[in-house]
């Protein structure tokens, strides 16, 4: 039986699908087939040790779906694993009843989805619940929605960066649900890959500008992205175009689940992609130019076309909703409501809950707000914890308008923000997409242990 999104939000605890497979199966009725399955990979270097992983099947190392802005997409998800998947499209502003789908095991329980993506950009998909296990086993992929008017000068290159927690025997460490990880920084891996490979050499045409679509697929690690031998243009964050700027010497910080679009102009040399990890620089892949020079080049003042997002937030008339995040190690959480029962901290931890939003741990509680369609909303976030919190909104994009009491102007529109530990942040958005939606942590272990809440738009 398939459960509805509303059933998940209300009953189970909370509540998309889309596009075209880059490489994979196609059904007779035109659906692209996305199949969750086990597979054996060679993650480690210079060894015959194999690692059992999970994936959404295609013929390459990673799953990349392609769609076109404004065109209908049809996908059928089949779950060949032995557990249910609450499948979610992160960053996609689609219909609320399709953005999260419950997919039970077995071909007979396949979930179909048809909708038209409104935004072009770089998005991703993966599990909403049981996220620590399913994400760290590799059950995620990249969604590329191409612009309605194609940008022919650019060659697309996908870079999905992950850290895997590998045990001494080469298997994925099975310490899922570890309480220490839940109350702390989350599950940190010890082996880095790009597109499922260790230190891959990725070929780029020398004759054309290249668009690098980068996803941080890690459970909890912030990726400090660095480039050697190149200084790409940043052209989009979280799928939304920005005024282009250089990456620069300081690099970029990508929170879990965040995406960034970068452009390397034609004619450049080879480059190295590296990560800043606790003060060390770790190389993760090599970008190698091949072929002769050409005449394709970026136009002067190049920028991506903006998406049709609602940017007319009426701050003066906006409704402000307080959102208090509590929990984690030394987080001061004494009690919270879980499944309509008020529990003390010990009882919460016994049930795997370590975090709360507005006094509610996990999905299924009272919504943090009910909004009218088109209403301007300000979320007044109070991060009353000892940890930075990467927060993600479903079905919308928001803009930081105040940080730590200081007004912010002209900030980019994103679906994910970082609220520093023990600080406050105000986020503004237009509630223009009806349905039941979610505000959640993008640290997998935190969302599994309670850092998630819902809101409704009527």
Protein language model annotation of sequence segments:
Residues 48-66, 190-201, 352-373:
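N-terminal edge beta-strand
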Residues 77-81, 215-217, 381-385:
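Asparagine-centered strand-capping/turn motif at beta-strand->loop junctions
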Residues 57-65, 94-123, 128-132, 248-253, ...:
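Aromatic/His-enriched, Gly/Pro-containing loop or helix-boundary segments
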Residues 96-106, 116, 174-317, 403-415:
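Histidine- and aromatic-rich segments of cupredoxin/plastocyanin-like copper-binding domains
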Residues 19-46, 50:
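C-terminal segment of N-terminal export signals and the immediately downstream linker at the start
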Residues 1-3, 7-25:
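N-terminal export signals
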Residues 70-71, 109, 115-123, 207-208, ...:
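Short tyrosine-centred short linear motifs in exposed loops/low-complexity segments
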Residues 25-37, 135-167, 242-388, 430-436, ...:
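Extended terminal and domain-junction accessory segments
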């Amino acid at each position: 039986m398939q459960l509805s999104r509303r059933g998940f939000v209300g009953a189970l605890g909370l509540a998309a699908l889309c596009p075209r497979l880059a490489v994979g199966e196609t059904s007779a009725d035109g659906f692209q087939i996305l199949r969750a399955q086990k597979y054996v990979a060679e993650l480690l270097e210079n060894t015959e040790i194999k690692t059992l992983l999970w994936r959404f099947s295609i013929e390459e190392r990673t799953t990349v779906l392609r769609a076109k802005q404004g065109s209908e997409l049809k996908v059928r998800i089949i779950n060949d694993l032995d557990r249910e998947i609450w499948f979610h499209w992160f960053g996609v502003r689609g219909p609320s009843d399709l953005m999260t789908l419950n997919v039970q095991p077995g071909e007979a329980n396949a979930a179909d989805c048809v909708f038209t993506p409104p935004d072009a950009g770089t998005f991703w998909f993966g599990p909403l619940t049981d996220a620590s296990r399913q994400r760290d086993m590799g059950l995620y992929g990249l969604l590329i929605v191409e612009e309605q008017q194609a940008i022919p000068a650019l060659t697309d290159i996908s870079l999905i960066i992950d850290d895997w927690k590998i045990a001494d025997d080469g298997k994925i460490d099975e310490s899922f649900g570890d309480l220490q990880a839940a109350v702390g920084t989350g599950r940190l891996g010890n082996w880095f890959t790009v597109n499922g490979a260790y230190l891959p050499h990725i070929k780029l045409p020398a004759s054309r500008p290249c668009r690098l679509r980068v996803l941080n697929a890690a459970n909890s690690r912030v990726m400090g992205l660095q480039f050697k031998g190149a200084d790409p243009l940043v052209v989009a964050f979280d799928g939304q175009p920005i005024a282009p700027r250089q990456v620069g010497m300081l690099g970029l910080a990508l929170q879990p689940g965040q995406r960034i679009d970068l452009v390397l102009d034609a004619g450049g040399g080879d480059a190295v992609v590296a990560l800043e990890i606790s003060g060390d620089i770790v190389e993760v892949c090599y970008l190698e130019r091949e072929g002769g020079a050409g005449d394709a080049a970026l136009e002067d003042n190049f920028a991506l076309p903006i998406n049709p997002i609602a940017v007319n937030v009426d701050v003066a008339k906006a409704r402000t909703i307080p959102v208090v995040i509590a929990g984690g190690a030394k987080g001061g959480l004494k009690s919270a409501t879980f499944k309509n029962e008020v529990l003390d901290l010990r009882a919460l931890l016994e049930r795997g809950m370590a975090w709360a939003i507005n006094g509610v741990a996990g999905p299924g509680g009272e919504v943090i707000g009910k909004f009218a369609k088109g209403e301007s909303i300000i979320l007044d976030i109070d991060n009353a914890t000892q940890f930075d919190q990467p927060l993600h909104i479903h079905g919308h994009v928001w803009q930081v308008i105040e940080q730590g009491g200081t007004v912010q102007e002209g900030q980019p529109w994103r679906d994910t923000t970082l609220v520093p530990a023990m600080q406050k942040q105000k986020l503004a958005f237009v509630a223009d997409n009806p349905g039941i939606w979610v505000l959640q942590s993008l640290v997998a272990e935190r969302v599994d242990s309670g850092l998630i809440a819902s809101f409704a738009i009527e």
